[in-house]
Structures are given as C-alpha cells and as structure tokens.
Amino acid sequence: MTSKKDALSSKIGIKIKLLRTKKNMSQEDLALSAGLNKNSIGAIERGESSPSIDTLDKIAKAFEMEVLELIDVSKVDL
C-alpha cells in the first residue's frame, strides 16, 4: 500500500510542477499564490511530501482549477 501512496504522491508532484512551469511560475510564485511555504511546494513536487486535502485545495485555487482536476493524474507517467 505504501508504494501506491508514494507513486500517487510522485504523480501529483509531477503534475503540480508541470502546471507551474506551464504557467511560468516559480515555486515561490506558487507558494505565495497558495499561501504556502516555498519549501513545501518543492517537497510536494519531488514526491517527498504527501499534501493534505487543504493544501491541494490551496494549490488548485492558485491554478484556478478544481481539486479533482488537479489530482487527476491518469495522464502522468513516472
């Protein structure tokens, strides 16, 4: 079960990084927009941290999307 959780965290992190770079945002820009710490964004993007629902909601709002769209990682490859 842990490996599935780790894979999901990694995929979510990859998607967040892809969305962030597509919008030409730095980690600091995203952190400020979402009201989070820049180090937290980095840890999430590297798959080192599993973001809470509240954190995902803040990130989704910063990207002007719904949480469900943010966590849809069906097209993200590791």
PLM region spans:
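Short, charged recognition helix plus adjacent turn
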Residues: 1-7, 71-78
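Alpha-helical residues within the helix-turn-helix
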Residues: 21, 32, 61
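Key DNA-contact positions within bacterial/archaeal DNA-binding proteins
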Residues: 39, 49, 68
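DNA major-groove recognition helix of helix-turn-helix
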Residues: 45, 63, 71-74
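DNA major-groove recognition helix of helix-turn-helix/homeodomain DNA-binding modules
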Residues: 54-69
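A short, Lys/Arg-rich alpha-helix, primarily the initiator
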Residues: 1-22
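Short alpha-helical DNA-recognition segment
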Residues: 24-43
